[in-house]
Amino acid sequence: MAVSSLGPEGMVDLNKFRLRRFVEKLNKLGEVDVIEKPTDLSDLATLIEENLRAIWFKDVGPDNLEIVASVNGSRYRLAKAMDVSPDNLVSEYRNRLKNPQPVIEIKNPDAPVQKVVLTGKDADLSRLPFYVQHQLDGSPYISSAIDYTVDPETGTTNVGCRRLSLRNSKEAGTNLTAPSDLKRIYTDACEKG
């Protein structure tokens, strides 16, 4: 896949694909329940599980975080993410898989993901909104975390979206029992020692 530093017109619209823009769009379509009142992290799982709509929590936990859940929890919302009707969702997925777009690289410090960078003692995973999601969870989790790995054999980048389990302030883990590219990369590395 080609890498470009600029978009097709020489400019990158940094807001076009922001999660906040999509949630605002869904909210205008009546697909989001907005919870303004303070919400404890321990209450999230029940509130999310009981609701079929997306939920936008405006004030969660001691740090007063905003959290959104179930954004992709229906075919309708997935279709809206791709600007197609639900009837055209599968064909749109197939079309996009067959026609990958070039990667647009945004250099530091312009990348929105680089607005807050914590290092050393300031890098503390427990400051993120991990919470117990299911009755039998052995630890708090964060949903829809993006993991990024590079296959050492091929150099191919692998990106996955998984639940991460909080181990301590510096470590999180994930489940590698389900078939995935990450599991294959891990298994291959273990076999090589």
For each feature predicted by the language model, list its residue ranges:
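Extended, highly charged
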Residues: A2-G193
